[in-house]
Amino acid sequence: MGNQLAGIAPSQILSVESYFSDIHDFEYDKSLGSTRFFKVARAKHREGLVVVKVFAIQDPTLPLTSYKQELEELKIRLNSAQNCLPFQKASEKASEKAAMLFRQYVRDNLYDRISTRPFLNNIENRWIAFQILTAVDQAHKPGVRHGDIKTENVMVTSWNWVLLTDFASFKPTYLPEDNPADFNYFFDTSRRRTCYIAPERFVDGGMFATELEYMRDPSTPLVDLNSNQRTRGELKRAMDIFSAGCVIAELFTEGVPLFDLSQLLAYRNGHFFPEQVLNKIEDHSIRELVTQMIHREPDKRLEAEDYLKQQRGNAFPEIFYTFLQPYMAQFAKETFLSADERILVIRKDLGNIIHNLCGHDLPEKTEEEPKENGLVILVSVITSCLQTLKYYDSKLAALELILHLAPRLGVEILLDRITPYLLHFSNDSVPRVRAEALRTLTKVLALVKEVPRNDINIYPEYILPGIAHLAQDDATIVRLAYAENIALLAETALRFLELVQLKNLNMENDPNNEEIDEVTHPNGNYDTELQALHEMVQQKVVTLLSDPENIVKQTLMENGITRLCVFFGRQKANDVLLSHMITFLNDKNDWHLRGAFFDSIVGVAAYVGWQSSSILKPLLQQGLSDAEEFVIVKALYALTCMCQLGLLQKPHVYEFASDIAPFLCHPNLWIRYGAVGFVTVVARQISTADVYCKLMPYLDPYITQPIIQIERKLVLLSVLKEPVSRSIFDYALRSKDITSLFRHLHMRQKKRNGSLPDCPPPEDPAIAQLLKKLLSQGMTEDEEDKLLALKDFMMKSNKAKANIVDQSHLHDSSQKGVIDLAALGITGRQVDLVKTKQEPDDKRARKHVKQDSNVNEEWKSMFGSLDPPNMPQALPKGSDQEVIQTGKPPRSESSAGICVPLSTSPQVPEVTTIQNKKPVIPVLSSTILPSTYQIRITTCKTELQQLIQQKREQCNAERIAKQMMENAEWESKPPPPGWRPKGLLVAHLHEHKSAVNRIRVSDEHSLFATCSNDGTVKIRNSQKMEGKTTTTRSILTYSRVGGRVKTLTFCQGSHYLAIASDNGAVQLLGIEASKLPKSPKIHPLQSRILDQKEDGCVVDMHHFNSGAQSVLAYATVNGSLVGWDLRSSSNAWTLKHDLKSGLITSFAVDIHQCWLCIGTSSGTMACWDMRFQLPISSHCHPSRARIRRLSMHPLYQSWVIAAVQGNNEVSMWDMETGDRRFTLWASSAPPLSELQPSPHSVHGIYCSPADGNPILLTAGSDMKIRFWDLAYPERSYVVAGSTSSPSVSYYRKIIEGTEVVQEIQNKQKVGPSDDTPRRGPESLPVGHHDIITDVATFQTTQGFIVTASRDGIVKVWK
């Protein structure tokens, strides 16, 4: 006993790969293990990886067909079970050598997942246990029993979704208790001897002996698959419950099984109970659940559904039932195959997710609470997608999600599950993703407040090496992110090290701790660890401080340079940081970098200490004489702060005070305020005696009167003298020989003071000219004194500016992409496209003369001479001399609106110059033919004229379009006031041979057109419908488009008709409906054929005129929205609708052409902004019913009217808010109910504003035409019906904030009533006998309704 073989020994043992020779759809990948029962392999299929289980057929008489049918039935029953993964296919292949089972491949089963990092935490264990019970419940409800639930058959995806697989209904239900051969053969495939089989499935071996007569042969298996004995015992639900309980117990004991075979048999007999294993389950609710599930008596075990109800709020949190299970189930559907789609869906739902998962967390709860809030389950979904994301926007969205969720997650989740993926993103191919990953990593690590034992070396061994390459990244944006975050990274790394050290010290001081030997050794010496950390960070900081891009250095200084000082300590802050920062002042071309230095130096100096003042003094002085005034302001602020902190020695303070005092008269307001701030701080720092003895002498020249409270800013500001004029200051500062200028100004000052008897005029004519210019700009003696006070600053600044110009010539470009026109001596030119009032000619002449002297020859070759009109041009002999005297030569207005002088003679002129002016460059005018004019014009002027003409045309087109939109009318001929059609049939037209799809009326209502599935378009004369003529036949028929014509529309303000067929053809037809004796004609003008695979056929179309464009807008079945410009035969715009929202069924365009709205087969109404071609909003019908027809509301600009499938519902939606405002309900069903006992729908709608009281005509599948009075709904009525319809009434009510007008049938009276008015004589019904497909109106001498139906009939009513 126990040694018998569980199967017939095969004559030939084949490898699992050999069975794939006859299978063409599957390619062998690798073996997943083999047992005597099954050989298991992984194979490749076009839809992904699959698991193939091969059963080698040794006995041809086995009834495999019945097993196959059973598996097929099981697959059908489990079709809707989202936590079950049955075999998708069962086949007998390989020349009947084997039977094969196929199912989707999932990488991990629960047995593997329990022992795989990152280990499952408590909330994940609960979630998996919850799903196991849910899967069992999903299987049991349709009558399926598993038969072999074990950890190897519970698959767990990368996002912790449980799939119960390998349903084993074909395995024996009962096993002999005294022979393990059958158990080993069928159930112990892992060879672990672990047993999950319910004890009642083991029976006395004698039962088998009485039925089997083959016991004499010891090689015969006790259980024969070919006999009927396996069907004797039916699998019970309680058996699966026991197995599931064993799996849940193993899950919560971290892989310790409840039973092996011998223990289970002992448990069956009451000789064993797994109390020791159950006590390892810490949670009381789970332990109680498992104990009930593994009860020895099957009757004492409950159903899976009962356990789920029992443990709701106990073992399983309420959020599993209310949110997580339904939300996570959507990702298990086939529609969510893309990782990018999952991330975008989660980002969209993030607010709702956090509200559901974290809304119960209160501020007073402990810090441990977030670990149990279920967010980790969502994190597993996010992290499972990260490595397979394709698009960079999805990757950025994923990083954004991590950043939002990180503050609500525990430490181990952040370190074990989030950090590795962030380091993965730091190697992404897109620079923006690398940069954002680094920022996110820094912020996530900063949230870690404690360090687990296994992560004590995470920074030096994992994080810093993982991002080290980013400091030398090719993309500046990545290095910028590194510089921005390295201070926080260093600070967090130091905190990690200190937390570890503190934890070790606490453990050493704890005498009861048994882990001292394990902890103190690996950590090593704190100083050694700190030094290694300093070296790693220092290497990257030095790399960033030496970066070729200044913006990287600037970012490093602006983002935590002081924190880096604290990290490195005083010595390294001085040796590493300060020494590199000083070099930034050598860059004379980037004042932003110099300014950032002074912004950052205060924090560094404060940490290094007052010893640095001697080093910083020349740097600060250099900042006070910088060429850029913004840098001076920042230097003043830095000095003020350092003085406040006591970082400046007193001699240095007075020295700086003498340098800064002249700034009190600087023309820059910020500099003056900065100087005042420094002076007031110094006054507070020194004694009163020093204020008046040492500080006041510096201030006296710049204040109007003596003051006492120098330390108050407002007081000092109120007594300051007027600053130097900005124009005088700038002119003097820009002069080339500023030293000689100040020498002469000093001599003039000495003369005023009486030190010199006389001051001779300057010998240098340039200085004389400069002085004359300054005096002409209003320089007074006080201004001269202030300039002399600023002498040292101005000379240094002048020299600094000269150095900048010199350096700019040494380099190709001081800044990439920047051209300094001022440095190159180029004067800008501009032409106003809008005419302004002309200046007097004499002023304009002076301005042009001044500018022309600086214009080079290349500029002249482009624009011609800049000689003003009053300059003597090359005048021909005999020309009017008044031109010279008045300065007004003959002028002509060019087509572009530019005034240009004209020459009137072909002779070569003389070259002349202006009197009392420096000679200007002469310009010769060209020789031209007699009796013509020569316009002195060059290439740039020609292009300028073309630009102006183009702008004028564009402006004119926009003005026309605006006028058209402002004057847009809903319809050219609205129904007459008080129009209420009586339902009298005027014309019955049966020319079409198949369903009529659409009716359209021309703008002036003289024609209306119909299109049909018979491939024809028929044009009819509206005038003939009044009954004054004998015939009402169509005047034109067009049938050359091919296919079934699905839609058509008239072009605004014309007799052009656009039609579209289901064969992809779109044609524009011209209609000549002339009066007699000429016969009407129709001919095609333009056409295009759409790609049926890419676009599909057109489902709806509209036309509108936008002034510059005549746009035919059409929507296709594959989601394309195209605006075809009929004037240029090209597309004005193209929009792409996402087919996830359903196929487009109809669309409508705003009357002002600002937006359009599309309706889909899934009930979605999506709006697009037509100006920017961007989606605006999207709203969905509550029942997701198909949108059959859309129309804009005539009064409310943001409303659309939508006819939807079922209940004859027509609703008016506010697309701005997504609210359903008004509903017409012609159905016996309760209003706004999502149930649809009435299948009838509205197929055609017509709406008119009707002088502020809008009316609506609807018609559809119930073959009735209804007139809806939207202002007075009670006045609505049925215009015409298919038969003698019962009378109806209309009532208004408010339901859930929506105003509903419901049609209710009146009760029929028993006998005939003479009081009931009749709409017409008692005759055959004149209404339609098939679905009405469309409705329209036209006006001649009275109003008419025209309807069409699916049987090809067109009827006209009045």
Curated annotation (Swiss-Prot):
GO molecular function annotations of the record = ATP binding; protein serine kinase activity; protein serine/threonine kinase activity
Modification Phosphoserine, positions = S808, S813, S853, S865
Keyword set for this entry? ATP-binding, Cytoplasmic vesicle, Endosome, Kinase, Lipoprotein, Membrane, Myristate, Nucleotide-binding, Phosphoprotein, Repeat, Serine/threonine-protein kinase, Transferase, WD repeat
Question: Can the keyword Membrane be found in this entry's annotation?
Answer: yes
The EC number on file is: 2.7.11.1
Query: At which residues are the WD repeats?
Result: 991-1030, 1040-1079, 1093-1134, 1139-1178, 1182-1223, 1237-1278, 1327-1358
Question: Is Lipid metabolism there in the keyword field?
Answer: no
User: Phosphothreonine occurs at which residues?
Assistant: T1316
Q: Which reaction does it catalyse?
A: L-seryl-[protein] + ATP = O-phospho-L-seryl-[protein] + ADP + H(+); L-threonyl-[protein] + ATP = O-phospho-L-threonyl-[protein] + ADP + H(+)
Q: Which residues form the active site?
A: D148
Stretches forming HEAT repeats:
373-411, 413-450, 458-495, 531-570, 572-610, 612-648, 690-726
Instruction: Please explain the role this protein plays, according to its UniProt record.
Output: Regulatory subunit of the PI3K complex that mediates formation of phosphatidylinositol 3-phosphate; different complex forms are believed to play a role in multiple membrane trafficking pathways: PI3KC3-C1 is involved in initiation of autophagosomes and PI3KC3-C2 in maturation of autophagosomes and endocytosis. Involved in regulation of degradative endocytic trafficking and cytokinesis, probably in the context of PI3KC3-C2. Regulatory subunit of the PI3K complex. May regulate membrane trafficking late in the endocytic pathway.
Q: Which PANTHER family match?
A: PHOSPHOINOSITIDE 3-KINASE REGULATORY SUBUNIT 4
Q: Subunit info?
A: Component of the PI3K (PI3KC3/PI3K-III/class III phosphatidylinositol 3-kinase) complex the core of which is composed of the catalytic subunit PIK3C3, the regulatory subunit PIK3R4 and BECN1 associating with additional regulatory/auxiliary subunits to form alternative complex forms. Alternative complex forms containing a fourth regulatory subunit in a mutually exclusive manner are PI3K complex I (PI3KC3-C1) containing ATG14, and PI3K complex II (PI3KC3-C2) containing UVRAG.
Q: What is the name of this protein?
A: Phosphoinositide 3-kinase regulatory subunit 4
